[in-house]
Structures are given as C-alpha cells and as structure tokens.
A protein has these predicted regions:
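Substrate-binding groove of N-acetylhexosamine-processing glycoside hydrolases
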Residues: 1-178
Length: 178
C-alpha cells in the first residue's frame, strides 16, 4: 500500500510524507502564500504553492484510498483470529495501517483546505483544516490506545513523525484563517 511519490524504485512514502509535506505547505502559506515551498523542489517542479498543494492532495488521496482498503482487509482478518494473535495484529500491523490511513486522510484534507484558502474560500478552508486536525489526533489516539503492559507510555514521545505537532500546527493555521 506504500505510496510512490516519484519514478525511482525507492520513492515510496511512509508516515513522514503525509505529516512533513503538509506542515511545510501550511507553514509556507502562513509565511508567504505568494511563494512556493522551496523545500519541496526535490519532489515537484510545481510553480506555485497552489500547484504544490494540488500535487500533494493527489498523492495523499491515493494513499488514503490504499490504506482504507488495507484497513478494511486487516480488520476483517482480525475477526477470525483467537484473542492473543488478534491483539498482536492490532498492536502492530493494524496500528501501522491506522496511522497511515489517518495521516494520509489528514494530509488530503489539509491540502484541500490550502487550495480553498488560496482561492479565498476561507470558511471551507477552516472547516477542512479542522477535519484534517481531527485525523491527525485520531492517528495519535490510535497509537496511545495500543499502549499496554510493557508498552505503556511507548508513544508518549512520538517525535520522529510527530503527528501531535501536525495537529498543533493545523490548530494555529485555523487561527490564522479565522
């Protein structure tokens, strides 16, 4: 289900793509919406911030669809397992799919919000930013829900991808739009 963002065999995105790229785009919008995000020139030759948001939206919608299918399949399979293997599946593979699904959905909504804001449709942009924020919070909640036993507190310092930071930034972006 990994999303290909470029032509090379190793150009496949993990959970960082739907967090880092939308954060870069949102930050650029708040900094100077007339300029594209120069830190994305390695990935796209889009000339404007809006084109970059459209590029990201297209990829992230595809990622959302892929992980939605994987999520449905994995959840269906988990129902046929005894309790111990089911818990292991939910703590590992299913959790990772949930994180990816929520992050890609959040990223697609973030890009939709940016496109609307760049078009001057601020009420819709605000609404979609709020939905995006909720998706990133859902990804964090999924991680925290799988902490138990020796894994208690394991995701409290999830700081590599930092989905909580993505949600926090979207909260500030919503304030900016307001």
């Amino acid at each position: 289900a990994a999303l290909a963002y470029g032509p090379n065999p190793d150009d496949h995105a993990g959970e960082q793509f739907p967090n880092y790229v939308p954060r870069m785009l949102v930050s650029q919008f708040m900094r100077d919406k007339q300029q594209r995000e120069s830190n994305l020139l390695w990935a796209t030759d889009a000339d404007t911030l809006q084109e970059q948001a459209q590029w990201c939206a297209k990829l992230c919608k595809e990622g959302q669809e892929r992980y939605s299918e994987a999520l449905d399949a994995c959840q269906a399979q988990s129902l046929h397992l005894p309790e111990s293997p089911r818990r292991l599946l939910r703590d590992s593979i299913l959790l990772q799919i949930q994180i990816y699904y929520h992050c890609y959905r959040g990223a697609a909504l973030t890009c939709q919000s940016l496109i609307e804001a760049l078009d001057g449709v601020y009420q819709q942009a605000f609404y979609h930013a709020g939905l995006a924020r909720e998706e990133y919070l859902a990804a964090n909640a999924a991680m925290r829900s799988r902490e138990h036993g020796k894994w208690s507190g394991f995701y409290a310092n999830e700081c590599l991808t930092d989905v909580k930071y993505t949600a926090w930034l979207l909260g500030h972006y919503m304030g900016y739009l307001r």
